[in-house]
Amino acid sequence: MTADRETGKDTNEFFRNMMISNLYGSYNRLWVAPDSLKRNIIDAIDSEIEKVKSGSSGYIIMKANSLTERSIIDKLSEASCAGVEINLIIRGICCILPGIEGYTENIRVFSLVGRFLEHHRVYMFGQKDERKIYIS
């Protein structure tokens, strides 16, 4: 829930598009699969890499049912090599091997398996006042 008007406009447009089976709408605030979700995640990871390169710290938390998308796995590995601290909370299949020196040493993976399947995802990039959180 939000009172943000831009998010409300995007949400309204999203549901309009769903009614006409348009999967490729243009949104300012929403990250929608299949069109913009992957691209926006990769851009956000790149932003954390740039923070580390400029002397700040980079931080990523991702919570999802699975992590199998090769381009995102490669980008997370690149971020780890750059020094970004990454915590992944993955319920099911996770195709990244954490803790490999020089490759995924800054990645930790937690697996939460319970009786009930959860469908929400949470992506957090950055820390403190600069963090951005995306929830679905």
Where are these regions (language model features)?
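PLD/PLD-like phosphodiesterase catalytic module centered on the HKD motif
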Residues: 2-8, 21-26, 34-136
